[in-house]
Amino acid sequence: MENKKEKTAPDVSVGADTEQPISKNTISSISENGGNIKSFEELQREMQLRSAPSYLQTISMNELFDTQYRSKQPLIDGLLYPGTYIFAGSPKLGKSFLMAQLAYHVSTGTPLWNYTTRKGTVLYLALEDDYRRLQERLYRMFGTESTDNLYFSVSASQLGNGLDEQLARFVAEHKDTKLIIIDTLQKVREVGGDNYSYANDYQIMARLKSFADAHGLCLLLVHHTRKQNADDKFDMISGTSGLLGAADGAFLLQKEKRTGNAATLEVSGRDQQDQKLYLIRNTETLLWDLQKAETELWKEPPEPLLDEIAELVMKDNPYWEGSPTALVALINMDIQPHVITRKLNVLAGRLYTEHGILFRSERVHEGRKLRFWKDNTENA
């Protein structure tokens, strides 16, 4: 067994974006049977090939499994993930109150409806409000319990006319930004954005999604619904299907009676199961409380490999490094060394989420080296 300690943990980003390997923001594993490091001439030829108009970037299945991607850490377990989401509902339904509630809980890291919440900076563009109304609303909802991680603005530029730069600057100045709420989407659409074609809607969402993915954060876009009913309730979202088609998911808030306090929140997305939550609005604080969930949150089945690593390898060690063969010798599992490396590339996100352990695989002169270390910045 090889066991070493380092004074400082290696700098590895564990974030949200699953589309990019850990090569710029993370680390890219090399195939277990990979060759020598590429020469300058090989890299030059590869760059020339990539610049050709006919070049199509592909990745083999072997390369896919030999690459470690960053996992999407949820902002709110089972409910809100990094990506671009539409939050739709009829006007004057209480959407902005629920947005303030989400923003407050993420900025403080306090559980929302008993769902675990991860703390981060939040920017709320309340573009249909003013600061006086915001102050009164927040005081009614939370009293004077405040937070330094929640920022508001009641004016912003439009897409293609300054908003992109404003958001990029805010994120650059607040590195731990996890959530940006734009209330409402219509307020930031480009001038002449009344063109509700599929192509136009898809392009708008793709542009916003590109920003959210690049920064590994959640972009929540408040939007309205149509008056007409639809067999699929998400078809009630105003605009064309291009909005939902390009988004990572959507939330749909509906009241049973417009004058009542009961509502349903339906959730559909790529990174969470479809679900329906039954909410009730507190008449004093105007906070939304959870009455019940129609379905229990789906949980991934236990993964013995991760439990073995947490218990046998990392229980008394803040840091461990060694070869895949050395790791296999430590755990009570029948698994081949090259298989364990690939499996850990896939499960690295779960290892961090469930046990607070970071993982890196890299090739050195002696062969492949695996490294594990505990993250002390937050609890697992």
Q: Where are the model-predicted features located?
A:
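Short, small/acidic-rich helices and loops at N termini and domain boundaries
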Residues: 1-53
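The Walker A/P-loop phosphate-binding site
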Residues: 46-145
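Conserved inter-motif catalytic segment of the P-loop NTP-binding fold
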Residues: 70-71, 93, 116-203, 210, ...
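Phosphate-binding/switch region of NTP-binding enzymes
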Residues: 71, 86-88, 92, 96-97, ...
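Conserved RecA-like P-loop NTPase ATPase core
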Residues: 80, 103, 124, 183, ...
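Helical mechanochemical/support elements of P-loop NTPase systems and associated helical scaffolds
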Residues: 130, 134, 159, 163, ...
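DNA transaction DNA-binding modules
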Residues: 278-380
